[in-house]
Regions:
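Short catalytic/metal-binding and nucleic-acid-binding patches
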Residues: 1-160
Length: 160
């Protein structure tokens, strides 16, 4: 992720589930990405470059996974489903949905039990490349962030 995604985006939230994952990112400014494209001496528009970075990340992960488990073949479908957060409520809903996803799928009973998402990175004091400050500022405090996530709300499939 550091090599491919972080140069073009800030990771806000993620959740890794056995058969899928969710990732909420904020892409860097067009100027920053254009400078990155120029520094790599490439001729590509910013949107294509961002998608190429994701493609490279998926391929890199698949190769490492296949090597580790002595297997061959693809891990991911040929498309990435994307949703754009249009409002502040969308961002809050996406973060909540992503962090509650393992509970929703019955993989754990409480968010804090799932180790494969960004929730624990937000509440931890350990160093992280996740945008922890974003969460604290967005929700007002770490306590407010935790309080929202303690809600026992059923998730609706919002085409995520």
């Amino acid at each position: 992720m550091k090599q491919y995604i972080l140069p073009v985006a800030t990771v806000i939230a993620y959740s890794l589930i056995p058969n899928h994952f969710h990732l909420l990112i904020r892409t860097k400014s067009e100027t920053e990405i254009s400078e990155l494209i120029s520094s790599q001496k490439k001729q590509q528009n910013t949107s294509d470059f961002i998608m190429q970075q994701f493609s490279n990340w998926f391929n890199s992960y698949a190769k490492a996974y296949n090597k580790m488990y002595n297997r061959k073949g693809t891990l991911f479908m040929d498309f990435v489903k994307r949703n754009k957060a249009e409002t502040d409520d969308d961002i809050t809903s996406f973060i909540f949905y992503i962090h509650k996803n393992a509970v929703h799928h019955g993989l754990c009973k409480q968010i804090v039990e799932w180790k494969y998402d960004s929730y624990s990175s937000v509440i931890s004091a350990k160093q992280t490349s996740l945008g922890r400050t974003f969460h604290i500022n967005w929700f007002g405090s770490k306590e407010q962030f935790i309080k929202l996530h303690l809600q026992s709300v059923g998730l609706k499939q919002k085409d995520l």
